[in-house]
A protein has these predicted regions:
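Long, internal low-complexity/basic segments
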Residues: 140, 216-217, 223-278
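Active-site His/acidic residue clusters
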Residues: 1-46, 85-87, 91-92
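Metal-dependent active-site segment of extracytoplasmic phospho-/sulfohydrolases and closely related
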Residues: 13-16, 52-90
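C-terminal cap/loop subdomain of S1 sulfatases and analogous C-terminal strand-loop tails that border
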Residues: 84-109, 125-127, 133, 138-219, ...
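Short, solvent-exposed turn/loop segments enriched in Gly/Ser/Thr/Pro and often Arg
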Residues: 13-24, 78-86, 160-162, 186-191, ...
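Soluble non-cytosolic domains of exported or imported proteins
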Residues: 41, 45-52, 131-138, 158, ...
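Loop/turn elements at helix/coil->beta-strand transitions in domains of secreted/extracellular proteins
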Residues: 5-12, 70-76, 204-207
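Non-transmembrane alpha-helical segments in soluble domains
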Residues: 1, 58-62, 66, 141-145, ...
Length: 278
């Protein structure tokens, strides 16, 4: 409120604890969803109620922007830090994860762990438009800088992300030029709550490759027809799989990425202590 009265541009980040565990909700929302019949996929009344409470909280923020008279001059970026846990409690066996039809969830480089909601509203952005242009949370900072008129600053040229302003201003249509083509995800440790296997992935175009570092197993998926990552194409298209593997390895070497080896524990050792790099 003070910033809106100052007439100066400002940045505000509101990080909700929802929808994180422990799953807790208001009595009002919980009673609403406990009365509903359970669906085939979504059955957790507490999770549904917590999600509605989050929605209510976002509504308070939007109403305040209207009240302060700055709603028409404000960009809002709504997103998550990662996919949901596959199930609760984390070690419980499940048929469909909370991210279904995406596979698995938080801690993994599968789509359930890395594909998240990303919604932007503001001046010059067409309401109800939709984009299938892949973006990353690394793009948020350079995009904000561009929207604020600072896209040419030297610092913006030294970070991983790129501005997506042109896509936002063009009803979600367009491509984004990146220094390193594709998206790279790296899990160089064993997490027994998740896969329990160190792995990395690369997404470029329609294809995604996952490499498991404990035995060099390769999984290749065509995300345009297999968003759930159920049909491994590595045996059918071995040259494609090897090409993506080589591209990913070059990227890790270029950036001196942490390399998995026995004994790496991400919770108790710093990167310097690991002392294993590409």
């Amino acid at each position: 409120e003070r910033q809106s009265k100052s007439k100066n541009p400002f940045y505000l980040q509101l990080s909700h604890y929802a929808v994180h565990s422990n799953i807790q909700a208001t009595k009002r929302s919980l009673e609403k969803y406990e009365k509903k019949e359970k669906g085939k996929i979504h059955k957790n009344a507490y999770f549904a109620a917590l999600t509605e409470d989050l929605d209510y909280s976002v509504g308070i923020l939007l109403n305040k922007l209207q009240e302060f008279g700055i709603a028409n001059n404000t960009y809002i970026i709504y997103c998550s830090d990662n996919g949901a846990v596959p199930t609760l409690p984390p070690r419980r066996k499940y048929k469909h994860s909370y991210n279904y039809p995406l596979s698995r969830g938080k801690w993994d480089a599968k789509e359930g762990g890395i594909r998240i909601p990303f919604i932007v509203s503001g001046p010059n952005i067409e309401p109800n438009s939709f984009s299938d242009t892949p973006v990353s949370l690394a793009d948020v900072l350079p995009t904000i800088a561009d929207l604020a008129g600072h896209s040419s600053r030297r610092q913006m040229k030294t970070i991983d992300g790129v501005t997506i302003k042109k896509v936002l201003y063009n009803s979600g249509i367009g491509k984004v030029k990146r220094k390193d083509k594709g998206f790279y995800f790296h899990v160089p440790y064993i997490n027994n709550i998740a896969f329990g296997r160190p792995h990395s992935s690369i997404i470029t175009g329609l294809y995604k490759l996952i490499k498991f570092h404990d035995d060099d197993e390769l999984n290749l998926f065509d995300l345009s027809i297999d968003i759930g990552e159920q049909n491994n194409l590595a045996m059918e298209f071995p040259r494609k799989a090897k090409k993506l593997e080589s591209k990913m390895e070059r990227y890790f070497k270029k950036h001196k990425t942490v390399k998995w080896r026995n004994g790496i524990d991400w919770k108790y050792k710093s990167i310097q202590e690991i002392n294993s790099f590409y």
